């Protein structure tokens, strides 16, 4: 039985509407699920014209009204914006507010059992904050409105999976957030996530923070004072956590099948290796030829 996926349209001034339309041109999507866009019908109609898509926009008031047929894009039309209300490619509070409200609505639908899962298009954090919604990203919005205290972000591309101790904070603050309790929390979330994905005995690689894992404290003591104690506590709890492993080698080992998931200490430490693997830029065409990978909220 096909499940209903609630798909946010993303920031209406950004690429979200176009991505949505292009993705739903593939008939295989409809073979595997029932996609329901949450957004503004007028914006999605413009995106259809812009990309030259042959499809019909079908506004609905409830997921039960969706047709879920290829060639028809069902959208829960919130009626927040029209094309003339904002400029494409420009940061604005109006677009940021709409993008936030799409996410809020899809969470509501999921919690009410009206959609089986959610998928989010990009939002602009600056625009969202201009609108008065002070969150640093999707992960934090989901955690807040589901009442989830323990959570993290996971990136995945094929068998490479990465979770993060911190994400959308400055590098200076990220270093301050490397604490035993938080590292242990993320290791535990990673272990449960792997088990939920069918990995019976997850092997968790934990990255260090400093060059060469601090070289015995010469280049920083986070590995000694925070990360290693967290790993030891996890192992005592029966979790197969290994490390700390130098950040410049742990991802090669993960790609080689040594770990099922990697715990990164901060945003770019985890994002860069995954995007090096999943993103391919064509020098001749001066365009991306592949952009693969997904961001999954855990907790």
Predicted features, each with a name:
Residues 136-162, 167-170:
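Flexible loop/hinge segments that line or gate small-molecule binding clefts
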Residues 296-299:
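Short, intrinsically disordered, charge-balanced linker/junction segments flanking boundaries
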Residues 89-91, 170-178, 214:
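Short coil/turn segments at secondary-structure junctions
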Residues 121, 128-134, 157, 161, ...:
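Helix-enriched interaction subdomains in cytosolic or periplasmic regions
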Residues 140-149, 171-195:
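Active-site glycine-rich loop that binds ribose-phosphate moieties when present
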Residues 1-138, 183-205, 209-265, 269-294:
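Contiguous, glycine/small-aliphatic-enriched amphipathic segments in soluble metabolic enzymes
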């Amino acid at each position: 039985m096909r499940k209903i996926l609630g798909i946010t349209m993303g920031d209406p001034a950004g690429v979200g509407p176009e991505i949505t339309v292009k993705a739903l041109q593939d008939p295989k999507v409809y073979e595997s699920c029932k996609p329901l866009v949450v957004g503004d019908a007028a914006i999605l109609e413009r995106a259809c014209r812009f990309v030259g898509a042959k499809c019909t926009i079908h506004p609905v008031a409830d997921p039960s009204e969706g047709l879920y047929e290829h060639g028809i894009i069902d959208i829960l039309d919130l009626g927040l914006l029209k094309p003339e209300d904002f400029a494409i490619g420009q940061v604005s509070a109006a677009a940021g507010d709409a993008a936030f409200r799409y996410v809020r609505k899809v969470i509501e639908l999921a919690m009410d059992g009206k959609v089986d899962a959610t998928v989010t298009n990009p939002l602009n954090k600056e625009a969202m904050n201009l609108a008065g919604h002070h969150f640093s990203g999707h992960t934090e919005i989901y955690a807040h409105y589901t009442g989830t205290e323990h959570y993290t972000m996971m990136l995945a591309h094929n068998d490479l999976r990465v979770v993060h101790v911190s994400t959308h904070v400055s590098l200076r603050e990220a270093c301050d957030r490397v604490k035993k309790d938080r590292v242990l929390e993320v290791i535990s979330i990673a272990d449960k996530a792997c088990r939920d994905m069918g990995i019976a005995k997850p092997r968790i690689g934990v990255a260090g923070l400093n060059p060469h894992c601090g070289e015995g404290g010469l280049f920083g003591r986070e590995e000694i004072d925070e990360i290693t104690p967290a790993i030891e506590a996890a192992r005592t709890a029966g979790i197969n956590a290994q490390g700390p492993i130098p950040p410049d080698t742990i991802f090669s080992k993960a790609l080689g099948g040594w770990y099922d998931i990697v715990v990164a200490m901060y945003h770019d430490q985890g994002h860069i290796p995954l995007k090096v693997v999943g993103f391919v830029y064509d020098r001749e065409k001066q365009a991306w030829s592949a952009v693969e990978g997904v961001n999954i909220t855990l907790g």
